[in-house]
């Protein structure tokens, strides 16, 4: 299934693209705060939108590896409330980043934080046994030991270890191509061994630009379809702004309604 990403400020434009192209089958909607849910409810209450399939990108600040108990519980309760409030839409899946922690603490007790992420996810899956969760690779420019916060989920081994510990078919991997380009990591073993979806966006490997396909050069329609054929992703999300999404859709020659 091919979908497009949306945030509250461009949801209306993305809904228009959904209605224009029959090959766009769902919208992955990013939620950070309550007003984002209100915007989603407003648009989904309209008769013409009742057939739109939705998936949810959980808040970017969701921190599955938080080690301060009070903050961890608050984080969990907030995420749980979001899932509860959008459950009437029967989302295809929920996507999340793993979070962040002090670099020195993470490198000295790595397995402890992977276990914390697992416990957070398993707790959600117990509370909501019918949902599917995908965990997304991210990038970090921090490359040496320091007291700074580092992003968790930049390397394939982190996901391999998490999925081995979790051993749960409701948990999958969201491969963000743009993040992998910046991080310069090969996630092929994770994708091949676990249920995986794709966030499709491109960049020049220096910043998270969220560029789309081009008609010439390296990243063309051929590149896209070879990637899809190679890995057989469960879901594919064009994680692009409205104009770049439309350009990429036209390059892919997706069918209109």
Predicted regions and their residues:
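Histidine-acidic metal/acid-base catalytic patches
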Residues: 16-17, 76, 90-92, 102-106, ...
């Amino acid at each position: 299934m091919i979908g497009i990403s949306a945030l509250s400020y461009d949801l209306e434009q993305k809904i228009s693209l959904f209605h224009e192209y029959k090959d766009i089958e769902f919208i992955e909607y990013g939620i950070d705060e309550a007003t984002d849910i209100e915007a989603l409810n407003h648009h989904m209450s309209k008769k013409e939108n009742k057939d739109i399939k939705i998936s949810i990108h959980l808040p970017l600040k969701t921190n599955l590896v938080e080690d301060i108990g009070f903050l961890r519980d608050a984080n969990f309760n907030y995420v749980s409330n979001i899932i509860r409030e959008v459950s009437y839409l029967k989302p295809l899946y929920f996507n999340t980043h793993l979070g962040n922690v002090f670099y020195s603490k993470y490198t000295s007790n790595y397995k402890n934080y992977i276990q914390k992420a697992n416990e957070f996810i398993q707790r959600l899956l117990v509370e909501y046994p019918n949902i599917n969760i995908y965990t997304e690779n991210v990038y970090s420019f921090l490359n040496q030991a320091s007291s700074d916060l580092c992003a968790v989920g930049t390397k394939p081994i982190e996901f391999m270890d998490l999925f081995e510990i979790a051993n749960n078919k409701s948990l999958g991997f969201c491969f963000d191509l743009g993040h992998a380009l910046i991080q310069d990591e090969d996630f092929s073993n994770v994708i091949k061994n676990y249920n995986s979806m794709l966030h499709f966006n491109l960049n020049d490997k220096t910043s998270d630009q969220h560029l789309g396909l081009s008609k010439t050069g390296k990243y063309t329609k051929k590149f896209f379809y070879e990637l899809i054929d190679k890995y057989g992703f469960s879901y594919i999300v064009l994680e692009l702004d409205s104009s770049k999404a439309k350009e990429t859709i036209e390059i892919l020659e997706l069918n209109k309604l």
